[in-house]
Curated annotation (Swiss-Prot):
GO BP terms: F420-0 metabolic process
Pathway entry: Cofactor biosynthesis; coenzyme F420 biosynthesis
UniProt GO molecular function: GTP binding; phospholactate guanylyltransferase activity
Catalytic activity: (2S)-2-phospholactate + GTP + H(+) = (2S)-lactyl-2-diphospho-5'-guanosine + diphosphate
Signal peptide coordinates: none
Name under which the protein is recorded: 2-phospho-L-lactate guanylyltransferase
Organism: Methanosphaera stadtmanae (strain ATCC 43021 / DSM 3091 / JCM 11832 / MCB-3)
SUPFAM superfamilies: Nucleotide-diphospho-sugar transferases
Length: 228
């Protein structure tokens, strides 16, 4: 059975998640990213052989080391930073590991849980992919050697599926609410408060006195600061 090597790309902790800036301060958003990463790591670390955080931000890399993760410093590129960073990390893995599968996860899916991980371990298809809301990719598992080209960005889910089919891979589309939720808006924070009670992220948001109520308006959830 191949070892699973997980890649988690993180561009920066600073000035991140700007769509949350009207609701959370910059330091609060930085700490949010940290606790979300802790949630992902805590749910996969017993099931994978290695976790590699790739970034060019020394702050991110140092925090990853603090969590006892391996790091890969992102190389300089003129464009398409995320996809080039992932390609470089995969190349690094191919030179330093034998008999491996690659799993790529974003750092902002704190509802990813051990049941999701066990699904990956049970199925081990050539290519497992989970869509995000809006057509992105929130999990990519590659269990066969081929010249994989990362296609993250707008509507990447459909591009990744087509690329896998073009390479004659058996594609398993793993549709999971918990994997689909990447955190970008206050409403997403509300979903964490509803569905993520056993997570570091839930505890962090609760300590910020953030509350959630059902809403019958444009947004399904009303998310608010209790002290305001």
């Amino acid at each position: 059975m191949n070892k699973i090597i997980t890649i988690i790309p993180i561009s920066s902790f600073n000035n991140s998640k700007t769509r949350l800036s009207p609701f959370l301060s910059e330091s609060e958003r930085t700490n949010l990213l940290k606790v979300m990463l802790k949630d992902i790591v805590s749910n996969i670390q017993d099931h994978v052989s290695d976790i590699i955080v790739t970034s060019k931000d020394e702050y991110v890399l140092n925090y990853a080391k603090y969590l006892n993760l391996n790091v890969f410093k992102e190389k300089e590129h003129e464009h398409d930073f995320l996809n080039n960073a992932i390609s470089d990390a995969i190349s690094y893995i191919s030179k330093n590991y034998d008999n491996y599968s690659v799993m790529i996860l974003p750092a902002d899916i704190p509802l990813f849980n051990s049941r999701n991980m066990k699904y990956i371990l049970k199925n081990r298809d050539d290519f497992i992919i989970s869509p995000s809301k809006g057509g992105g990719t929130n999990l990519l598992y590659i269990n066969r050697e081929y010249n994989y080209k990362p296609l993250f960005g707008a509507f990447s889910f459909f591009k990744h599926v087509q690329e896998a089919k073009n390479n004659n891979l058996d594609v398993n589309i793993y549709d999971s609410f918990y994997l689909s939720l990447d955190v970008n808006t206050p409403e997403d924070l509300g979903e964490i408060l509803l569905h993520g009670r056993n997570t570091h992220t839930y505890n962090y948001l609760s300590n910020l006195n953030i509350g959630v109520e059902s809403n019958h308006g444009k947004e399904r959830l009303y998310v608010y600061r209790k002290n305001e």
